[in-house]
């Protein structure tokens, strides 16, 4: 599964109300993603504070400890929100572990990069994670409820990737895969089939289901 290497892109955090508010998802889903992003933001701000404190003390980062910290805290948050990452949404457990490993790897490799432990980075991670989780759970819920078709939607602005622009309004059977550049995806933000960073990071596309 491809991992979103946020620090390798020129991504700038956008206020959550604007970031999600401009998307064509339902108002209830916008609110859910905003609340989810706020919780993820809090988690990573705490993480970055702990990492910064370790560095100030001259300690070498305990990679396993911090990866486990992210994984445990993230799963606790999902449980609090009633999101089942074991049976209903099994991809989440894999995603969380790999995302945690990638975030800590970046911090280990770039100890002098202040952005690695910044509030802006926490927001960028939160925005991407909230959309990834939102798109995945909406897809799985649509499958479970008997929906049979899905339509790819974009923001229709200059920030939309060319490979995503080509998919605007495309409707296909729900279990078929969208051809997105060099990759295949079940829905926007889907990395379960190996989609690369260039097709997922900062993406605000969404699917509708019928």
Residue ranges with predicted function:
Residues 120-210:
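Acidic, glycine-rich two-metal-ion catalytic cores of nucleic acid-processing enzymes
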Residues 1-148, 208-210:
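N-terminal leader/targeting and assembly helices and adjacent pre-domain segments
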């Amino acid at each position: 599964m491809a991992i979103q290497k946020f620090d390798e892109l020129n991504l700038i955090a956008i206020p959550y109300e604007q970031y999600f508010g401009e998307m064509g998802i339902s108002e209830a889903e916008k609110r859910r993603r905003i609340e989810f992003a706020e919780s993820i933001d809090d988690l990573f701000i705490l993480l970055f504070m702990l990492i910064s404190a370790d560095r100030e003390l001259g300690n070498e980062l305990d990679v396993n400890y911090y990866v486990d910290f992210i994984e445990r805290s993230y799963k606790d948050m999902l449980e609090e929100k009633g999101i089942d990452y074991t049976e209903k949404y099994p991809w989440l457990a894999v995603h969380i572990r790999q995302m945690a490993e990638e975030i800590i790897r970046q911090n280990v490799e770039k100890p002098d990069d202040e952005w690695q432990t910044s509030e802006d980075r926490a927001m960028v991670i939160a925005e991407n994670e909230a959309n990834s989780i939102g798109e995945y759970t909406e897809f799985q819920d649509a499958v479970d409820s008997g929906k049979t078709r899905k339509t790819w939607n974009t923001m229709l602005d200059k920030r939309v990737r060319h490979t995503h622009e080509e998919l605007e309004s495309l409707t296909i059977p729900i279990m078929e895969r969208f051809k997105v550049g060099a990759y295949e995806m079940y829905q926007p933000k889907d990395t379960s089939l190996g989609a690369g960073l260039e097709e997922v990071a900062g993406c605000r596309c969404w699917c509708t289901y019928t």
